[in-house]
């Protein structure tokens, strides 16, 4: 908001988490302390910062609606499945903005909305700060994110599957 502009160097990107680490050389840059996002509780008051629809910086208020939410968005639906859900309005342009608790600590990074119209209907998702910190650390240390892969997927057991596996019920 002070009108300064900086060039940034891309340190690393991670498509599955939709996160990147950028290096900016500057002075008097403000930072946010990271909260332990595991300690976030449903009902906690949160503030969502961003630039919705390109109108300029804004802050909206809401609560944490749920934790551990999954979305079906991302390359081959492989996006992380541990989002913080909030009803703080997150609209197009808020992605990458901060989701902050009332102590001014970063609890998440605004990432997605779930909406049939593309506008906010009170279902927004943020990447938890702990996950973002893990991705950031790996990008800085290794240039990429290392993940384990089991080669297993989960699906509901339907009556047809139950019969094929000789199960008593689905």
Where are these regions (language model features)?
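Serine-dependent protease modules
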Residues: 1-170
């Amino acid at each position: 908001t002070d009108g300064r502009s900086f060039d940034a160097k891309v340190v690393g990107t991670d498509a599955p988490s939709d996160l990147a680490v950028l290096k900016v050389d500057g002075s008097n840059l403000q930072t946010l302390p990271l909260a332990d996002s595991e300690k976030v509780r449903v009902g906690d008051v949160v503030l969502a910062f961003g630039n919705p629809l390109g109108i300029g910086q804004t802050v909206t208020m809401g609560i944490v609606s749920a934790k551990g939410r999954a979305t079906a968005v991302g390359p081959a639906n492989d996006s992380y499945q541990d989002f913080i859900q909030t009803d703080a309005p997150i609209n197009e342009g808020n992605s990458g903005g901060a989701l902050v608790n009332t102590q001014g600590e970063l609890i998440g990074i605004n990432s997605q909305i779930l909406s049939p119209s593309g506008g906010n209907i009170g279902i927004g998702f943020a990447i938890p700060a702990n996950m973002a910190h893990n991705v950031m650390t790996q990008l800085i240390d290794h240039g990429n994110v290392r993940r384990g892969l089991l080669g297993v997927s989960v699906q509901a057991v339907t009556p047809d599957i139950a019969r094929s596996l000789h199960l008593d019920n689905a």
